[in-house]
Amino acid sequence: MINLQVNNKFGFGLMVAAVLFSILGTIGLTTKDSVDSIPTPNVPNSVFFADEPMQSNPLALLINSNAQIDWDRNDVFLVIGDADKKAQCDGLTFIEMVNQNSEVCTSRDNEFAAIGDDNQSGLSWQAKSGEYFVGIGTFSEAPEDFELNIDYEVKMTFSAVGYFVMVILFASGFTLNKYQ
């Protein structure tokens, strides 16, 4: 029977853990869900945000979270904005919202974190840490329907820093195993 010392066992455990986590980080974890019966706004080309922020990525340094959002109507666009952009859009008066000359808080506004104006290709966004809100708007005054159904998928994989941490973990285990 092989009698390994504590350092050897711990080093071997670190190396195995680093390899397993690297494999799991490469494969990734995917979650899917849907939200049904979201009421749509009737003000053309204006964004209305959700009250609650999206779940942030507190481990953004180690884990990449990529979201793909699809919806069932072509007369609706989706945006993702930070808390400052939400406050700006929520602070607009009705006259400012219906102003066709303004691009603020519309589908043409480039200050959003992500804009999805086509329900066929959807909206792709890499989740970041911080407060981000989903907003919806309609392209026309009279929407085709009063409800919106959204499907989303979030895939989480290791970032480059995550792999670097696993290499350091493996090297630490190797060092503990090699040098008693």
PLM features: what roles do these ranges have?
Residues 2-180:
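Acidic, Ser/Thr/Pro
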